[in-house]
Structure formats: C-alpha cells, structure tokens
C-alpha cells in the first residue's frame, strides 16, 4: 500500500517525477509542479494521466483550447 501524502514528502524538486508503483507494465508516477515548469512534449507509446491533488494546472494541448484543472480533477492525455 502507498500513502500519496507521504510519497509527496520525499519529493524535493519540482517536475522530477517519482515512480511510486507499477501496474500492467505501466508506471504510476507523482510529481510536484510549479508555474510553467512542464516542457512541451508528447508520448507516442502511452497515454498520460493527470490527477490534481492540490492547487491547479493550466493544461495546453495541441489544437485544443486551454483549460484549468483543479483539485480532484482527472484527465487523460491520449498518445499521439
């Protein structure tokens, strides 16, 4: 069993994802994000799931309107 609050306490750098478990050959990672620290990128082989624990995140997707995710929001970015 994993405690996400305790796992976050071990992260001391922003946008430095940490693997907390694995399921069906996929990693479950957590990260602290501040400001615009996420570099633009895409995933060709896997989807990416975002779940907001605290705060909010401005989500920008190619050819889509921007939107803001807030606490307890979940969103999946499909692979390209």
Where are the regions a protein language model picked out?
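A short, N-terminal "cap"/entry segment at the start of jelly-roll beta-barrel domains
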Residues: 1-31, 40
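Short, surface-exposed charged micro-motifs
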Residues: 19, 49, 58, 66, ...
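A cytosolic small-molecule/anion-sensing beta-strand core signal
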Residues: 24, 53-54, 70-71
């Amino acid at each position: 069993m994993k405690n996400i609050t305790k796992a976050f306490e071990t992260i001391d750098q922003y946008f430095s994802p940490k693997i907390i478990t694995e399921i069906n050959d996929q990693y479950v990672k957590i990260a602290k994000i501040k400001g615009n620290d996420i570099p633009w990128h895409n995933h060709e082989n896997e989807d990416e799931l975002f779940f907001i624990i605290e705060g909010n995140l401005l989500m920008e997707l190619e050819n889509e309107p921007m939107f803001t995710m807030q606490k307890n929001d979940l969103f999946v970015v499909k692979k390209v």
